[in-house]
UniProtKB/Swiss-Prot annotation:
NCBIfam families: nadA (TIGR00550), PRK09375.1-2 (NF006878), PRK09375.1-4 (NF006879). It comes from Thermus thermophilus (strain ATCC 27634 / DSM 579 / HB8). Keywords: 4Fe-4S, Cytoplasm, Iron, Iron-sulfur, Metal-binding, Pyridine nucleotide biosynthesis, Transferase. GO terms for cellular component: cytoplasm. The keyword Transport does not apply. InterPro entries: NadA, NadA_sf, Quinolinate_synth_type2. Its cofactor is [4Fe-4S] cluster. It comes from the Bacteria. Pathway: Cofactor biosynthesis; NAD(+) biosynthesis; quinolinate from iminoaspartate: step 1/1. The lineage of its organism: Bacteria, Thermotogati, Deinococcota, Deinococci, Thermales. This is Quinolinate synthase. Disulfide bonds: none annotated. It catalyses: iminosuccinate + dihydroxyacetone phosphate = quinolinate + phosphate + 2 H2O + H(+). HAMAP family: NadA_type2.
Amino acid sequence: MGRMRGEALAQEVLRLKRERNAVILAHSYQLPEVQEVADFVGDSLGLAREAQRTRAEVIVFCGVHFMAETAAILNPEKTVLLPDLEAGCSLADSIRPEDVLAWKAKHPDGIVVAYVNTKAEVKALADVCVTSANAVEVVSRLPQDRPIYFVPDMFLGAHVARVTGRRLDLFPGECHVHAGIREEHLKALLEAHPGAEFLIHPECGCGSGCLYLKPDAKMLSTEGMVRYAKGAEAREFVVATEVGILHRLKKEAPEKAFFPVKPDAVCEYMKRITLEKVYLSLKEMRHVVRVPEEVAGRARRALEAMVAVG
């Protein structure tokens, strides 16, 4: 995309947005040029809340499919557009409704906690949904005497179990990007930047190993990372998550330096959303995300419980 072309396209997107009474919501892993035209950039929890709060008639969701589904479930009266319907999620794809039903059959009094990175059909079977920003708080409030099934991210689940001291049954799912971030990637960076603070996303595969290397690591959601980096005294940060967050970190804390643990930790699904696709989506009102009401109605309860916490 040439410079003029990029700027002209961005102007067209903003013009169409006004014309359609639309709001553009973007996840922190989106391409920088997509983040720049968004009305709000944030994590799953912030985006879900913003979708609930908006007065716009149209929500253009620059993220992956389950996020647009979440916005559609929370706003049945609004039009939700996903600029590329192929923007999926390996973690959300890892679990099926049958997996949850099988566990429920064995644990009729059990509680199913679904990470927001799941399809609507799985959320519909959950008692509560969580994001990485509020999973610890939600789980710590659950009744002590009932079994809990945490799906689908086993690394986030292990982190929640570690912090809350609760015994959780974990589904063996993972995000392929975060699971690929390992201790060996971290070691060299920490040696090169001995004074740097270490920010790690709880989906990372190296959770316990990385904490062993750097016991004072901060395990945070993407929003938590931005908030922490802005307020911390440290000038250098080593960051373990998808690299799209670096644009936002540098923008919101320009005087600080950020080093990705794995510079090629890129979610190809997130990067499917381009400025051109945002433009076409708004221009033609294409790629509307709809969730059948019999699924949405059940999933809505679990999502509303999530949005209320943290």
